[in-house]
Amino acid sequence: MSRTDDPGVAGLQVYIVGGAVRDGLLGLPAGDRDWVVVGATPEDMARRGFIPVGGDFPVFLHPRTKEEYALARTERKSGRGYKGFTFYTGADVTLEQDLQRRDLTVNAIARTPQGELVDPLDGVADVRARVLRHVGEAFAEDPVRILRLGRFAARFGDFSIAPETMQLCRRMVEAGEADALVPERVWKEVSRGLMAQAPSRMLDVLARAGALARVMPELHDDAAVRAEIDRAAAAGLPLAGRYALLCRHTPERDALGRRLRAPVECMDQARLLPLAVDALAASASTAAQLDLIERCDALRKPERFDALLQAAAIVAPVDLSAWRARVQAVRAIDAGAIARQCAGDPARIKPALRQARLQALGGA
């Protein structure tokens, strides 16, 4: 059912906005569609069965498709940081006013249900020219937009950033706007940037803006780090592995993880990766192999260890098949049987178990 014959929106002015329009112009697969509604009130939406889900401003779920519909709105800066905004969603707000509040011109394009583009800010031209450009000076009112710019640069590797946009980001950082960012928002954008096709571009944007030292002051950022996270992206590593490589040269990786409130899985990988890389490079002895397996808790968490090896393989070659066989061989040992053999002399259990594991590795 198209929006032209959908009774839920019949008589409403609705437009697809933002990323779905941009990605369609780029020939990319369509993701979730966001809709903006012009000329309606919350009461109008409720009468049609739309489900309110918005917090700061009216957003509704379509009663059948569950797609998001937001009332057109304007916003005004009323405080510091990304939460310091007052929103207005009156029925008199126009589509052009709603588009004007958006971050980048490529994200400020709307499309009617019939497919007609509404582009008052020349976003289509910037899509074609592969340029990320801020919509207006209101960009400076929300420091999250610096992070989003970095994330979009990482996602769209062939896009450049307009010089005036980068200059504006620098002024924002110098004015202290980036200092108002909270960890949850930083992590949300950084993690999405790490999962993009060229994560190093995010670091480049944040560093050039002066924001990297503000939001991740512990991070050691250099060419090696950037090359490794890009190789991790090309290899399709999951987030934990990419984050571990990001932090590999950072002595204060635990402090960085706490600052960002990174997930436990990411912090564990960041802590263990330097151990794994050093151990893999140092020795091929069975004792060294067992030490690594035990220190990384590979017997209880083989999937995590496998992911760790894949991250280590970004740094130096790793025989993943051989290591998987080693872990499997050690896990196959019957620790209970060894304990029974040492009945009456518990002190013998630990060395006997280690000896059995070494023998298993020797035959793996």
From Swiss-Prot:
<dbReference type="InterPro" id="IPR050124">
    <property type="entry name" value="tRNA_CCA-adding_enzyme"/>
</dbReference>
<keyword id="KW-0548">Nucleotidyltransferase</keyword>
<feature type="binding site">
    <location>
        <position position="148"/>
    </location>
    <ligand>
        <name>ATP</name>
    </ligand>
</feature>
<feature type="binding site">
    <location>
        <position position="151"/>
    </location>
    <ligand>
        <name>CTP</name>
    </ligand>
</feature>
<feature type="binding site">
    <location>
        <position position="32"/>
    </location>
    <ligand>
        <name>Mg(2+)</name>
    </ligand>
</feature>
<feature type="binding site">
    <location>
        <position position="148"/>
    </location>
    <ligand>
        <name>CTP</name>
    </ligand>
</feature>
<dbReference type="GO" id="GO:0000049">
    <property type="term" value="F:tRNA binding"/>
</dbReference>
<feature type="binding site">
    <location>
        <position position="22"/>
    </location>
    <ligand>
        <name>CTP</name>
    </ligand>
</feature>
<dbReference type="InterPro" id="IPR032828">
    <property type="entry name" value="PolyA_RNA-bd"/>
</dbReference>
<keyword id="KW-0067">ATP-binding</keyword>
<keyword id="KW-0694">RNA-binding</keyword>
<feature type="binding site">
    <location>
        <position position="102"/>
    </location>
    <ligand>
        <name>CTP</name>
    </ligand>
</feature>
<dbReference type="GO" id="GO:0005524">
    <property type="term" value="F:ATP binding"/>
</dbReference>
<comment type="similarity">
    <text>Belongs to the tRNA nucleotidyltransferase/poly(A) polymerase family. Bacterial CCA-adding enzyme type 2 subfamily.</text>
</comment>
<keyword id="KW-0479">Metal-binding</keyword>
<feature type="binding site">
    <location>
        <position position="19"/>
    </location>
    <ligand>
        <name>CTP</name>
    </ligand>
</feature>
<dbReference type="GO" id="GO:0004810">
    <property type="term" value="F:CCA tRNA nucleotidyltransferase activity"/>
</dbReference>
<dbReference type="GO" id="GO:0001680">
    <property type="term" value="P:tRNA 3'-terminal CCA addition"/>
</dbReference>
<feature type="binding site">
    <location>
        <position position="34"/>
    </location>
    <ligand>
        <name>Mg(2+)</name>
    </ligand>
</feature>
<keyword id="KW-0547">Nucleotide-binding</keyword>
<dbReference type="GO" id="GO:0000287">
    <property type="term" value="F:magnesium ion binding"/>
</dbReference>
<keyword id="KW-0460">Magnesium</keyword>
<dbReference type="Pfam" id="PF12627">
    <property type="entry name" value="PolyA_pol_RNAbd"/>
</dbReference>
<dbReference type="GO" id="GO:0042245">
    <property type="term" value="P:RNA repair"/>
</dbReference>
<feature type="binding site">
    <location>
        <position position="151"/>
    </location>
    <ligand>
        <name>ATP</name>
    </ligand>
</feature>
<feature type="binding site">
    <location>
        <position position="22"/>
    </location>
    <ligand>
        <name>ATP</name>
    </ligand>
</feature>
<keyword id="KW-0819">tRNA processing</keyword>
<protein>
    <recommendedName>
        <fullName>CCA-adding enzyme</fullName>
        <ecNumber>2.7.7.72</ecNumber>
    </recommendedName>
</protein>
<keyword id="KW-0808">Transferase</keyword>
<feature type="binding site">
    <location>
        <position position="102"/>
    </location>
    <ligand>
        <name>ATP</name>
    </ligand>
</feature>
<feature type="binding site">
    <location>
        <position position="19"/>
    </location>
    <ligand>
        <name>ATP</name>
    </ligand>
</feature>
<dbReference type="InterPro" id="IPR012006">
    <property type="entry name" value="CCA_bact"/>
</dbReference>
<dbReference type="InterPro" id="IPR002646">
    <property type="entry name" value="PolA_pol_head_dom"/>
</dbReference>
<dbReference type="Pfam" id="PF01743">
    <property type="entry name" value="PolyA_pol"/>
</dbReference>
<keyword id="KW-0692">RNA repair</keyword>
<dbReference type="InterPro" id="IPR043519">
    <property type="entry name" value="NT_sf"/>
</dbReference>
<comment type="function">
    <text>Catalyzes the addition and repair of the essential 3'-terminal CCA sequence in tRNAs without using a nucleic acid template. Adds these three nucleotides in the order of C, C, and A to the tRNA nucleotide-73, using CTP and ATP as substrates and producing inorganic pyrophosphate. tRNA 3'-terminal CCA addition is required both for tRNA processing and repair. Also involved in tRNA surveillance by mediating tandem CCA addition to generate a CCACCA at the 3' terminus of unstable tRNAs. While stable tRNAs receive only 3'-terminal CCA, unstable tRNAs are marked with CCACCA and rapidly degraded.</text>
</comment>
